Amino acid sequence: ILRPFQGVLCADSGHINVHETGAVEATGHKVLALPSKEGKITGQQIKEYYDLHWSDESREHIVQPKMVYISHPTEVGTLYTKNELENISTVCKECGLYLFLDGARMGYGLMAPGTDVTLPDIAKCCDVFYIGGTKVGALFGEAVVITNPCLKQDFRYCIKQKGGMLAKGRLLGVQFLELFKNGLYFEISKHAIDMAMLLKDGLKEKGYEFFMDSNTNQQFIIVEDAKLQEIRQKYGVTYQERYDETHS
């Protein structure tokens, strides 16, 4: 999708910026991080960055923004509203930027209580998105959906060149055929959300505080270091990030 001198705008907390081992940079494209609020970026931020780049007379010395990356839910479990998503999409179309939505946990975003974003909304707003399989019951894989006709041509060449074309690719596709029969994909996602809310309520009763107020199954509990060490005596555990000098 991108030419060698083009980069990807995303939230500074975005998955490709913090938890992908530099994968985007490894393919030759710089991640252009924007300050996030509760894991999200806005259409206004994207427009301001775009305008700043194209008003720079020496812009050919700088990586050109060409794609916007967001995830739903975000890396911290928050959700975009329909209005926020449409606003980002509008800005991207006006500026000639591609909008990519990371849907690894999309099922949980769609089934979270209070959300007004639907799968058709995502398809309408994004140039490319993918439907997460691994985190919603599949053995492996994600389903890439390209809605922009200009990006569809030769995409299979890219898949093959990057080592993503499986000899037994039918095994990947059949999982999604089953997941989308009789609403199973959404049933699995809703069950996970329901269980996460039970866990959240129980932890709140125990006095634990949360990094974000998330309605998804991404629940980040703030834990004292001493308690974390105590847990480690019995279980394998990692933390997302340091919260302060004595908490994770």
Predicted ranges, named:
Residues Y80-A112:
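Catalytic PLP-binding core of fold-type I/II PLP enzymes
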Residues L2-V18:
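Conserved PLP-anchoring active-site segment centered on the Schiff-base-forming lysine
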Residues C10-A11, I70, T78, L99-G103, ...:
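General beta-strand structural signal in soluble alpha/beta enzymes
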Residues H19-H29:
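Active-site-proximal loop->helix
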Residues K37-E38, Q64-P65, Y69-S71, L79, ...:
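Active-site C-terminal subdomain of aminotransferase-like
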Residues G28-P73, Y80-N87:
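PLP-dependent aminotransferase-class I/II
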Residues P4-G7, M197-S248:
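Conserved C-terminal alpha-helix-loop-beta "cap" of PLP-dependent enzymes
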